[in-house]
Amino acid sequence: MDTGKRLAEIWNESYISSLPSLVKDRGYMYADNVQRDVLITGFNPSFRDGEAVGALHGPIQTIWEEKKHDNYWSPVRKMLYDGNIDLRSRTDYLDIFYFREQDQHFLKDKILSNPNGIRFVVDQLNLTMHIIEDIVSPKLIIIKNKESWAYFGKFFDEKGWVWMGYKFEHIQNMECGELCRITGLLESKERIAPEIKQTNLIGAFVLFTKHINQYTSLSERPTPQILKDILNWYETEEIVRSLSI
């Protein structure tokens, strides 16, 4: 999957002209994703006045190693590195959507309310699912924004929302979120990537957290130790299964 090529195709679709002009004018932003054990997901890249527009991308490792404080990225970095444990080289990041806007209500109010907006959402989510499945293939996903939960299929039993359509097994509730495991894909014609017949992520852990920022209490933040323990759990199970005869 060539992420840049696919996004260029999406932004050149005829329906783009029917969406708010800022979608086309600002362009899109994406990470140069690679295979990693941990994947952190956000919602969509923000846009601040004066920032460059167009097709912007780069490796997430640059952000992981940045020392300068950032209201968004600094709390994320603290989940990965504490001086004793360093998960930065094992972690990738993506936003599930690629349009640039600061207002978290923009998608609901301006995109999903537009008949053509649904296709825009589906096309982006289809790309995102392929990146997760085919490129990153993580052992642990941290879904770091409650707004994103629905798009993974988390609320299917409660609301009937399918979108990417993962099936989850609840493992346990923790102060920093709900830990689940991927068990397969929903059998639904509404899945946004019907060409994906089986997931490569069976057994992968998913930690559903709230949106984490500088104001989030320490107890509600995943720590490097917690993430390392979950990874160790996954890897120990792999070792035990390899002994099966």
PLM regions with names:
Residues 1-9, 114-126, 153-245:
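C-terminal capping/extension of enzyme domains
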Residues 51-67, 108-115, 162-169:
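A solvent-exposed, charged loop/short amphipathic helix patch at secondary-structure junctions
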Residues 92, 96-122:
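Charged, often glycine-rich, active-site loop that binds/positions anionic groups
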Residues 38-42, 86-95, 139-145:
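A structural signal for short, well-ordered beta-strand segments and their strand-loop junctions
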Residues 44-48, 97-101, 146-150, 211-215:
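Short, solvent-exposed loop/turn segments at secondary-structure junctions
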Residues 50-52, 103-106, 145, 149-156, ...:
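A short acidic (Asp/Glu
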Residues 126-148:
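Proline-aspartate-enriched helix->loop->beta-strand connector
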Residues 1-75, 124-127, 131, 182, ...:
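Active-site and ligand/interface coordination hotspots across diverse enzymes
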